[in-house]
């Protein structure tokens, strides 16, 4: 009899988990507390409890070729950066294509997940759910938690002296939907992540004045990168990743700063990060520099004091009149349906091996999918996690001894720099390609560049020097997709299809053959260094 797997949440990771279970012959049941799939990507006019919330104008920060499921490309006529409404349609197409809807129970809240009395023998879980006010209990052989980390707003009011005296309006960015409420108002946005920056820029079109307060600064990138290419298709390549990871961290940090400043000098705009030794997730926004240079958005330091109708910033004695404060101060994550002994969260970190498995369980039958912030797209990350996790749940792949897993988790929490490559500032951040390759290696699905160079050199060159698109993860191993090679070789065609809407006659490039030869030599040298 097939193992029964309970999946909590029908967002991008939940859908991938359902599909992976079906591919491995398991019996998944997905519980979704809302009335539709999509999680974060389903816009609603009102905030729903226990579900991520987005604003009407949200567009993906990762382009369609980099953020699709590995065996299901976005439609070629979709824009490279996808608005939330089209992203939701894509998720629905994915669910229909692989018959996932039959496994989802909508309007069903997971109340409690507990180990069965004989857990040490069976590894089973009791899952208590609630549908239309009625509670039910069922036994499952495994559980996959796919609830994400954008549901519990972090609102540190204690850090803002005088906030209780403020007579204006204030709220967390989770509540933001449209900019209309800011018309002719003086607005302060606290926090310079992607949401805070988006809200400040969007608000500046209607507001009287907009301040964006940041404590540590941030690198700001445009989605439009070198030569007009999508940023992640240029930045996320195996060649660049190997190059960065082979250099000392100070050199990589200097190169990163130089690249970030090639768009505009961050110091001249008051944005340069105070701590440049550790990489904080860059902010993706195409308009912020223009808003700053035209005076629509003013960058300010942290808040010293909030008064009845104004605020005082640190190092600036002048009071600034404020009508509305938006706290874009991020989120905390928790698992209210799980006992703390199962997944313990301390200081914003969970003791999960490879960000997936609790290290102390005698039976590895619970997996957390999507609780990670890679410098890359979440969909292929969560999908690859699910592919490996399902094979562990099924017993095909084995985990290391508990001592080895604990040692790795503790090392990650300490976040000690290795001295090479990028050093990330948060425990939930990771090197996208390195992390994906670790998981692919566990299921024997990592592409073998040396072998491909001998049998399919065109594909090998594209994989190594081109963008690390998710199709690479389906070239071999379990779940191999016969369309992967073609998807890789045509990825730029789909990218340009929606931008080249006016055909221009191009002159031939005289050095094209030379560049190809140099690329081949560089690949051979890289492979030589790898196997040295």
Swiss-Prot record:
Q: Which residues bind FAD?
A: 9-13, 32, 40-41, 61-62
Q: Name one GO biological process term.
A: negative regulation of fatty acid oxidation
Marked site positions, Important for substrate binding = 208
User: InterPro entries, alphabetically?
Assistant: FAD/NAD-bd_sf, Flavin_mOase, Flavin_mOase-like, Flavin_mOase_1, FMO-like
Task: List positions binding NADP(+).
Answer: 60-61, 195-198
How would you summarize where this protein is expressed among tissues? Liver.
Molecular function via GO: flavin adenine dinucleotide binding; hypotaurine monooxygenase activity; N,N-dimethylaniline monooxygenase activity; NADP binding; trimethylamine monooxygenase activity
* Residues with N-acetylalanine modification: 2
Q: Which SUPFAM superfamilies match?
A: FAD/NAD(P)-binding domain
Residue ranges spanning the membrane: these are 511-531
What is catalyzed by this enzyme?
Answer: hypotaurine + NADPH + O2 + H(+) = taurine + NADP(+) + H2O; hypotaurine + NADH + O2 + H(+) = taurine + NAD(+) + H2O; trimethylamine + NADPH + O2 = trimethylamine N-oxide + NADP(+) + H2O; N,N-dimethylaniline + NADPH + O2 + H(+) = N,N-dimethylaniline N-oxide + NADP(+) + H2O
Keyword annotations from UniProtKB, A to Z: Acetylation, Endoplasmic reticulum, FAD, Flavoprotein, Membrane, Monooxygenase, NADP, Oxidoreductase, Transmembrane, Transmembrane helix
Q: How does it sit in the membrane?
A: Single-pass membrane protein
Cytoplasmic compartment ranges equal: 532
Q: Which cofactor does it need?
A: FAD
Q: Where in the cell is it found?
A: Endoplasmic reticulum membrane
Listed under GO cellular component are:
endoplasmic reticulum membrane
Q: What class of enzyme is it?
A: oxidoreductase
Q: Pfam families from the xrefs?
A: FMO-like
Q: Which family does the UniProt entry place this protein in? A: Belongs to the FMO family.
Concerning PANTHER family, the annotation shows: DIMETHYLANILINE MONOOXYGENASE
- Tell me, in a sentence or two, what this protein's role is: Broad spectrum monooxygenase that catalyzes the oxygenation of a wide variety of nitrogen- and sulfur-containing compounds including xenobiotics. Catalyzes the S-oxygenation of hypotaurine to produce taurine, an organic osmolyte involved in cell volume regulation as well as a variety of cytoprotective and developmental processes.
Name this polypeptide is given:
Flavin-containing monooxygenase 1
Which source organism? Canis lupus familiaris
Q: What is the lineage of its organism?
A: Eukaryota, Metazoa, Chordata, Craniata, Vertebrata
């Amino acid at each position: 009899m097939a193992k029964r797997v309970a999946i909590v949440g029908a967002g991008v990771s939940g859908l991938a988990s359902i599909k992976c279970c079906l591919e491995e012959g398991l019996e998944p049941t997905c519980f979704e507390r809302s009335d539709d799939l999509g999680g974060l990507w389903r816009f609603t006019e009102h905030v729903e409890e226990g579900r991520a919330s987005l604003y009407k104008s949200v567009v993906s920060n990762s382009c369609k070729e980099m953020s699709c499921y590995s065996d299901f490309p976005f439609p070629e006529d979709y824009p490279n950066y996808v608005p939330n409404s089209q992203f939701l349609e894509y998720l629905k197409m994915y669910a229909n294509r692989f018959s996932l809807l039959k496994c989802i129970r909508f309007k069903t809240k997971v109340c409690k997940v507990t180990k069965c009395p004989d857990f040490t023998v069976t590894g089973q879980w009791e899952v208590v759910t609630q549908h239309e006010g009625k509670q039910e209990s069922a036994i499952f052989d495994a559980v996959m938690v796919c609830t994400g980390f954008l549901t519990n707003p972090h609102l540190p009011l204690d850090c803002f002296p005088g906030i209780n005296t403020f007579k204006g309006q204030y709220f967390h960015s989770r509540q933001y939907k449209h900019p209309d409420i800011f018309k002719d108002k003086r607005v302060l946005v606290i926090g310079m992540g992607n949401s805070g920056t988006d809200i400040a820029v969007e608000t500046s079109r209607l507001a009287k004045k907009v301040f964006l307060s940041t404590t540590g600064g941030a690198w700001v990138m445009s989605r439009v990168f070198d030569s007009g290419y999508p940023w992640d298709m240029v930045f996320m390549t195996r060649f660049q990743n190997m190059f960065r990871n082979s250099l000392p961290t100070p050199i990589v940090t200097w190169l990163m700063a130089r690249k970030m400043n090639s768009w505009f000098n961050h110091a001249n705009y008051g944005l340069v990060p105070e701590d440049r030794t550790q990489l904080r997730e860059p902010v993706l926004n195409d308009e912020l520099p223009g808003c700053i240079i035209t005076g629509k958005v003013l960058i300010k330091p942290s808040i010293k004091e909030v008064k009845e109708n104004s605020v005082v910033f640190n190092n600036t004695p002048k009071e600034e009149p404020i009508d509305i404060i938006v706290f874009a101060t991020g989120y905390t994550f928790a698992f209210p349906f799980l006992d703390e002994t199962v997944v313990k969260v301390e200081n914003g970190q969970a003791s999960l091996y490879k960000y997936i498995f609790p290290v102390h369980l005698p039976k590895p039958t619970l997996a957390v999918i999507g609780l990670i912030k890679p410098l890359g797209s979440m969909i292929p990350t969560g999908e690859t996690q699910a592919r490996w996790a399902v094979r562990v749940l099924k017993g095909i792949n084995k985990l290391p001894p508990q001592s080895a897993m604990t040692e790795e988790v503790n090392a990650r929490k300490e976040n000690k720099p290795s001295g090479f490559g990028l050093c990330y500032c948060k425990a939930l951040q990771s090197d996208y390609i390195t992390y994906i390759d670790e998981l692919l290696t566990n299921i024997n699905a990592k592409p073998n560049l040396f072998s491909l160079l001998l049998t399919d050199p065109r594909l090998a060159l594209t994989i190594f020097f081109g963008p690390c698109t998710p199709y690479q993860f389906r070239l071999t191993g379990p779940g191999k997709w016969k369309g992967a090679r073609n998807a890789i070789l045509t990825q730029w065609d789909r990218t340009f299809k929606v931008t080249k809407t006016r055909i221009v006659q191009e002159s031939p490039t005289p050095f094209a053959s030379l560049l190809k030869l140099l690329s081949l030599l560089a690949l051979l040298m890289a492979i030589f260094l790898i196997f040295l």
